[in-house]
């Protein structure tokens, strides 16, 4: 499962700078939607072959009131659920009382912690960092997050235990990525069959108290009592195998404590990190929205993370019963206005409590998964690419027309289309969005985003010594030189 890195430290030590540097390396086109708000505290990062969730826990001042009382509840949860903690300090400001208080808390939690001395640019770093050894948390790592110095080395070192699971070699390179190779027809068919035979992993996500617990129990059956308030279950989600009409599912539970007989009395435990990890590990995301509260910023944040991860998506607007027609019309209008950028996703209006509309969710879940794992031939993808060029030619780049040559499938779930050509990486984002939308319309993809990768064609003469002429070229060159000399004499 994808590791979680928590950035911890007092205010103004550079946590946000490092967070922004790590998260903006993930530039998949699928996340480039207008109107989509991004959560400033949780992000998906990709650096040096490692993929991980990074969490900015916010500033902790460590006052005399006690470190526990000064830390936000979500910050404490982030530290508890993180696999790696980067304890950031300010090398210029030196060791402070707040640093000591934070270190004491981290020592008590026995988390895998790395002390990072930030802002070492332009100073004697070794001297400035010496006092941080007294924190008793091991080696002190130097970094200048604003300039990017030491960032990659820090991530490689701190996430080294996860390298084997991610297929990363000792030289820091990962295995050949899906988009760097072209599937043969046999490989594509075998991969599609493998995916279709697997159970659909479904993550039901949403902000607290939107009805995730009620819906999960409705899906599992009312007679089933589900209690997950046990040691060891607070960190990872629960995986529940189930079957419906011959189709196997694995339900990823993120709701926390739930007892069927006391579902109305139990306050749902909500963990952002648990939810994000479930999104990374699932095939289809079922996002629950509360009809009575409308679309909240937290809903958009979860939606953004699901799109970043390239997951197939179904939206369920819960608590639809019991509200009058005027409110229903207003909610539908808001959905059209704020969720227009995900018009590929099915939206259902349900009542998890009474079961209204729940059965139809399965149809959309299976439809979304089938779209995400559908096999499309290279010839079909290339033909669609050519049709897109005919409708809207690529722009000029440095006075030359960008040429698109061919396209092929680069992966499934999410579907990845790799377009090869000349100067394609210089294409403006507007044209890339045009291509993505064109493929989605042409393939009639429902319930899943499409990712488009662009690869420049290689130079077949690269690495060759073109200055050395062959024997026949030398002869022709001598004849030409002689001809020119004779002409000049005349």
UniProtKB/Swiss-Prot annotation:
Binding site for GTP 1: 9-16, 56-60, 118-121
Keyword Repeat set for record: yes
Domain KH-like: from-to ranges: 374-458
Record bears the keyword Hydrolase: no
InterPro entries for this protein: G_ENGA (IPR031166), GTP-bd (IPR006073), GTPase_Der (IPR016484), KH_dom-like (IPR032859), KH_dom-like_a/b (IPR015946), P-loop_NTPase (IPR027417), Small_GTP-bd (IPR005225)
Parts forming coiled coils: none
Keywords: GTP-binding, Nucleotide-binding, Repeat, Ribosome biogenesis
Residue ranges of every copy of the EngA-type G domain listed in the record: 3-166, 200-373
GO biological process, one term: ribosome biogenesis
Function: GTPase that plays an essential role in the late steps of ribosome biogenesis.
Subunit structure, interactors included: Associates with the 50S ribosomal subunit.
UniProt similarity note: Belongs to the TRAFAC class TrmE-Era-EngA-EngB-Septin-like GTPase superfamily. EngA (Der) GTPase family.
Protein name per the record: GTPase Der
Species name: Shewanella piezotolerans (strain WP3 / JCM 13877)
């Amino acid at each position: 499962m994808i590791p979680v890195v928590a950035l911890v430290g007092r205010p103004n030590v550079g946590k946000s700078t490092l967070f922004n540097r790590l998260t903006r390396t993930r530039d998949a086109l699928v996340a480039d939607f207008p109107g989509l708000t991004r959560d400033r505290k949780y992000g998906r990062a990709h650096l040096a072959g490692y993929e991980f969730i990074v969490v900015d826990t916010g500033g902790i001042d460590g006052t005399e009131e006690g470190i526990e009382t000064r830390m936000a509840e979500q910050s404490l949860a982030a530290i508890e659920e993180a696999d790696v903690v980067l304890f950031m300090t300010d090398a210029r400001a030196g060791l402070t009382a707040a640093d000591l208080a934070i270190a004491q808390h981290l020592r008590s939690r026995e988390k895998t912690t790395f002390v990072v001395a930030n802002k070492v640019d332009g100073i004697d770093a070794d001297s400035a960092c010496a006092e941080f050894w007294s924190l008793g948390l091991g080696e002190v790592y130097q970094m200048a997050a604003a300039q990017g110095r030491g960032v990659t080395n820090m991530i490689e070192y701190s996430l080294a235990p996860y390298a084997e699971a991610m297929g990363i070699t000792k030289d820091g390179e990962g295995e050949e990525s899906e988009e760097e190779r072209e599937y043969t027809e046999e490989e594509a068919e075998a991969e599609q069959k493998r995916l279709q035979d697997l159970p659909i992993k479904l993550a039901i996500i949403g902000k607290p108290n939107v009805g995730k617990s009620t819906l999960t129990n409705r899906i599992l059956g009312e007679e089933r009592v589900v209690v997950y308030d046990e040691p060891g279950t607070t960190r990872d989600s629960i995986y529940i195998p189930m079957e419906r009409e011959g189709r196997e599912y694995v339900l990823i539970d993120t709701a926390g404590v739930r007892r069927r007989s006391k579902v109305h009395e139990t306050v749902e435990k909500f963990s952002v990190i648990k939810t994000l990890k479930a999104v990374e590990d699932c095939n289809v995301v079922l996002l629950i929205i509360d009809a009575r509260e409308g679309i909240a910023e937290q809903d958009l944040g979860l939606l953004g993370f699901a799109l970043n991860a390239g997951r197939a998506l179904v939206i369920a607007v819960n608590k639809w019963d019991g509200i009058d027609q005027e409110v229903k019309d207003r909610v539908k209008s808001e959905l059209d206005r704020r969720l227009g950028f995900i018009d590929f996703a099915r939206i259902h209006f349900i009542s998890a409590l009474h079961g209204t509309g729940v059965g139809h969710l399965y149809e959309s879940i299976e439809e979304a998964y089938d779209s995400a794992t559908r096999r499309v031939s290279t010839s079909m993808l290339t033909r669609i690419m050519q049709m897109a060029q005919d409708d809207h030619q690529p722009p000029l780049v440095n006075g030359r027309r960008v040429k698109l040559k061919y396209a092929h499938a680069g992966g499934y779930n999410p579907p990845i289309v790799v377009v090869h050509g000349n100067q394609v990486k210089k294409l403006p984002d507007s044209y890339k969005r045009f291509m993505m939308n064109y493929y989605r319309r042409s393939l009639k993809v429902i319930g899943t985003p499409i990712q488009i990768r662009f690869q420049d064609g290689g130079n077949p003469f690269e690495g060759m010594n073109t200055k050395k002429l062959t024997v026949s070229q030398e002869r022709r060159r001598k004849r030409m030189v002689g001809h020119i000399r004779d002409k000049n004499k005349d």
